[in-house]
Amino acid sequence: MQGRLSAWLVKRGLIHRSLGFDYQGIETLQIKPKDWHSIAVILYVYGYNYLRSQCAYDVAPGGLLASVYHLTRIEYGGDQPEEVCIKVFASRRNPRIPSVFWVWKSVDFQERESYDMLGISYDNHPRLKRILMPESWIGWPLRKDYIAPNFYEIQDAH
């Protein structure tokens, strides 16, 4: 079943894949990494002016990594804001996705957290560096194939 946004994208020749609807009726779309930045700009111009959240997850051990964006179309005088969920999958070997920082500034720390925990590199992000783990940390703690070190160095807080 195709939703309103998916039909609108098809009508304009924008490549995507509909993944259906969640339990709240929010449409979920899959966008290829190479198409993501241009489609993000188009969605912003179309009215999706609020990025509610961005997160990432490891699909399966040895499999793909996913970056997920929850967008909201807020219109003045509208009763119910329209929402959409966008999933962008990246290969585990070289997980690179265009950053949408220059479209929605609120994604700044969220993309940094996804980089820090899963190793997804967001191209053209102005400050892509670890945010939770120390810069010296090796590996990506939320990947399903991550092997936790058997020691932890206690650092002085001073």
Curated annotation (Swiss-Prot):
GO BP terms, alphabetized: photosynthesis, light reaction
Catalytic activity: a plastoquinone + NADH + (n+1) H(+)(in) = a plastoquinol + NAD(+) + n H(+)(out); a plastoquinone + NADPH + (n+1) H(+)(in) = a plastoquinol + NADP(+) + n H(+)(out)
Subcellular location per the Swiss-Prot or TrEMBL entry: Plastid, Chloroplast thylakoid membrane
A UniProt-annotated Pfam family: Complex1_30kDa
EC numbers for this chain: 7.1.1.-
Record's GO cellular component terms: chloroplast thylakoid membrane
Keywords: Chloroplast, Membrane, NAD, NADP, Plastid, Plastoquinone, Quinone, Thylakoid, Translocase, Transport
GO molecular function, one term: quinone binding
Membrane topology: Peripheral membrane protein
Biological function: NDH shuttles electrons from NAD(P)H:plastoquinone, via FMN and iron-sulfur (Fe-S) centers, to quinones in the photosynthetic chain and possibly in a chloroplast respiratory chain. The immediate electron acceptor for the enzyme in this species is believed to be plastoquinone. Couples the redox reaction to proton translocation, and thus conserves the redox energy in a proton gradient.
NCBIfam families: PRK12494.1
Subunit structure: NDH is composed of at least 16 different subunits, 5 of which are encoded in the nucleus.
Record-stated family: Belongs to the complex I 30 kDa subunit family.
Entry protein name: NAD(P)H-quinone oxidoreductase subunit J, chloroplastic
Protein species of origin: Jasminum nudiflorum
Name of the gene this protein is made from: ndhJ
